[in-house]
């Protein structure tokens, strides 16, 4: 059992017969009454986000999530095929499991597949990915003093804001946490 006082971002817990990942939490000590922990949790099966309040010191069950390194092979209609790097066993995941992750997945990419009691519940991407720009407007020379941006579409179909100097064919390093441009690759 884990005390809610020990919550950390990314911790997985089992509450109300569901598996939750702690996205955000805050310890609150009101002037009157007992302390409590306000948390924002993501259901790993459905993807739903819920705010939940726990009394300070309350205990919750930890969820033992198993991470397996796998390589993304290809998309087959609405399913996506991954291969285990150790056993070479292939696993298919529906697009329902891969919501935001589809913006960054490209063939050959290494990911962590998360399972709970044999059931696949999610995919964890690397913190950054390198993707090639397939479409963007040409930048206007000399117009970089203002830090202006333009939109660009990368090879996966994802569209993001980039600096004006980025051109088609450039390789970009993108943060998978928030989808933002970091630098050219």
Curated annotation (Swiss-Prot):
Pfam family, one: Elong-fact-P_C
GO cellular component, one term: cytoplasm
Lineage top rank: taxon: Bacteria
Keywords carried by this UniProt record: Cytoplasm, Elongation factor, Protein biosynthesis
InterPro entries: Elong-fact-P_C (IPR015365), NA-bd_OB-fold (IPR012340), Rib_uL2_dom2 (IPR014722), Transl_elong_fac_P/YeiP (IPR020599), Transl_elong_KOW-like (IPR013185), Transl_elong_P/YeiP_cen (IPR001059), Transl_elong_P/YeiP_CS (IPR013852), Transl_elongation_fac_P (IPR011768)
Biochemical pathway: Protein biosynthesis; polypeptide chain elongation
Signal peptide: none
Cellular location(s): Cytoplasm
Keyword Cytoplasm in record: yes
GO molecular function, one term: translation elongation factor activity
Main location: cytoplasm
One of the protein's GO biological processes: peptide biosynthetic process
Tagged with keyword GTP-binding: no
Family: Belongs to the elongation factor P family.
Protein's job: Involved in peptide bond synthesis. Stimulates efficient translation and peptide-bond synthesis on native or reconstituted 70S ribosomes in vitro. Probably functions indirectly by altering the affinity of the ribosome for aminoacyl-tRNA, thus increasing their reactivity as acceptors for peptidyl transferase.
UniProt-listed HAMAP family: EF_P (MF_00141)
Official protein name in the record: Elongation factor P
Organism: Staphylococcus aureus (strain NCTC 8325 / PS 47)
Gene: efp
């Amino acid at each position: 059992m884990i005390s809610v006082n020990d919550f950390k971002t990314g911790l997985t817990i089992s509450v109300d017969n569901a598996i939750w990942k702690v996205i955000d939490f805050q310890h609150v000590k009101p002037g009157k009454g007992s302390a409590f922990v306000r948390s924002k949790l993501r259901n790993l099966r459905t993807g739903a986000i819920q705010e939940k309040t726990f009394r300070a010191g309350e205990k919750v069950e930890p969820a033992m999530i198993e991470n397996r390194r796998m390589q993304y092979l290809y998309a087959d209609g609405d399913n996506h095929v991954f291969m285990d790097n150790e056993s070479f066993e292939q696993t298919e995941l529906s697009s329902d499991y891969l919501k935001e992750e589809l913006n960054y997945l490209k063939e050959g990419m290494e990911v962590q597949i998360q399972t709970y009691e044999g059931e696949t519940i999610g995919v964890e991407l690397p913190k950054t990915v390198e993707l090639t720009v397939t479409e963007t407007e040409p930048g206007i020379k000399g117009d970089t003093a203002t830090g202006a941006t333009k939109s660009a579409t990368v090879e996966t179909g994802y569209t993001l804001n980039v600096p004006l100097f980025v051109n088609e064919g450039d390789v970009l390093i993108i943060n998978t946490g928030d989808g933002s441009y970091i630098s050219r690759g």
